[in-house]
A protein has these predicted regions:
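The Walker A/P-loop phosphate-binding site
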Residues: 3, 7-123, 143
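Phosphate-binding/switch region of NTP-binding enzymes
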Residues: 181-320
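Conserved inter-motif catalytic segment of the P-loop NTP-binding fold
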Residues: 69, 89-181, 185-186, 190
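A structural signal for short, well-ordered beta-strand segments and their strand-loop junctions
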Residues: 96, 158-159, 207-209, 247, ...
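Helical mechanochemical/support elements of P-loop NTPase systems and associated helical scaffolds
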Residues: 18, 43, 47, 62, ...
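Glycine-rich phosphate/pyrophosphate-binding loops
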Residues: 321-329
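Terminal-proximal interaction/regulatory segments of ATP-powered molecular machines
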Residues: 328-334, 338-381
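Conserved, well-folded catalytic cores of nucleic-acid-processing
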Residues: 54-57, 69, 81-89, 110-114, ...
Length: 381
């Protein structure tokens, strides 16, 4: 008897396919993964045009770290992001972990955020201040809010700072007893393992603020073979889990902005009106790692407007030749004037000096917003 053609031979049953096996596995273990959840993604402005361009439009859900010296601008920038988060993300609430004991009246007024200290007052668009420096307690609150979120809220957490936290065990010890070595690093790792995926997938954001620490060298002449991304505290886990790591550099005299920039500082005749914040991007999601960003702060402003956006906008306007500075005058091109006119915005053609143009823009916020959005849409790729 001859052999049957291949197309007539019975097909051997090999069992479920790889697709069906995977499908069954996902269903059986649905409580252990996030594949069935829709990812919630957005961008929140940093408040600075230059930093928004560097971050491709702002910060996304997930963990971010702000590190650096004191008075570098870490807390102010974290609150700037929080303000924009509460304004632009639907059903949003914020939570500030006050672990260092610093949240002055002046900082609150500058931020433009409504801070509350009771659970009953914690409405959408507000920030609850949790005054606690016990690592386990802070971690459990974050974990509970993220994992038990039947209301569908979007949370932003600011931890100020990682260095102010201690373990519960260490808090019960006397001053003479030894504390747990690398206790914060261990718990940081445990915390991020528990919440990192849910934090980014479900559209929550966290900013952890850290100080910098000096390395102790037994031999100051020995070669340094230890390559470190930063000198921030909290262990390596926070470095790996973070989307963005921004290092705020110290402020020096040359970073100050004077009333008369070309003259020497004088307490009466030439006052300090602001300063430039300098940031090094230590980790990024868009290949801007190790690049430097600078943005100006204007003193005396309140309600979340301390970033001197007019200053940044003018720099970009002149850089892209939408206006030219010749002699004592700054003159806008006819093309850009016509472009704004189509948006029902009237732009004055000539201004006597950059300072007068800056004052003009401060009085015409819609024009600033138009240029800001134009540069973001063009440059923040």
């Amino acid at each position: 008897m001859g052999r049957k053609p291949k197309d007539q031979e019975p097909v051997q049953d090999t069992g479920p396919s790889a697709k069906s096996r995977l499908s069954s596995f996902l269903k059986e273990n649905k409580d252990d993964h996030y594949n069935y959840e829709e990812e919630i993604y957005y961008k929140v402005s940093t408040g600075s045009l230059n930093l928004d361009i560097a971050t491709s439009g702002g910060l996304c859900p997930g963990l971010h770290r702000f590190i650096g010296m004191n008075e570098g601008g870490k807390t102010s920038e974290a609150l700037e992001v929080m303000k924009n988060f509460l304004k632009t993300v639907k059903d949003s609430k914020a939570l500030l972990f006050k672990a260092e004991g610093r949240l002055s009246k002046e900082i609150k007024e500058r931020s433009g955020i409504k801070f509350v200290t009771s659970a009953e007052e914690w409405e959408d668009g507000t920030c609850f201040v949790f005054e606690c420096n016990i690592f386990e307690t802070v971690s459990e609150l974050m974990k509970d809010l993220i994992q038990n979120n039947d209301e569908g809220k979007r949370y932003m957490f600011v931890l100020d700072s990682v260095d102010g936290l201690m373990t519960k065990g260490d808090s019960l010890k006397s001053m003479t007893e030894a504390t747990k070595v690398a206790g914060g690093a261990v718990i940081s790792s445990m915390l991020m393992k528990r919440i990192s995926l849910a934090l980014s997938k479900r559209g929550h954001m966290a900013i952890f603020i850290s100080q910098v620490r000096s390395d102790i060298k037994l031999d100051p002449y020995a070669a340094n073979k230890d390559i470190r991304q930063t000198t921030a505290t909290g262990g390596n886990a926070l470095l790996h889990f973070a989307n963005w790591i921004l290092e705020f550099e110290p402020k020096f005299g040359k970073d100050l902005i004077l009333e008369k920039p070309n003259e020497r500082y004088d307490q009466v005749k030439n006052k300090i009106i602001g300063h430039n914040v300098k940031i090094v991007i230590k980790k990024s999601t868009n290949e801007t790692t190790n690049s430097k960003v600078q943005y100006p702060i204007k003193y005396g402003r309140k309600d979340g407007s301390s970033v001197w956006r007019e200053y940044e906008v003018i720099d970009q306007i002149l850089s892209w030749e939408f206006a030219s500075a010749k002699g004592a005058w700054v003159t806008f091109t006819d093309e850009i004037i016509e472009e704004l006119k189509k948006e029902n915005l009237e732009l004055k053609k000539q201004h006597q000096g950059v300072d007068n143009l800056r004052s003009y823009l401060e009085d015409n916020r819609p024009i600033v917003d138009y240029f800001y959005n134009k540069f973001i849409n063009t440059l923040a790729l």
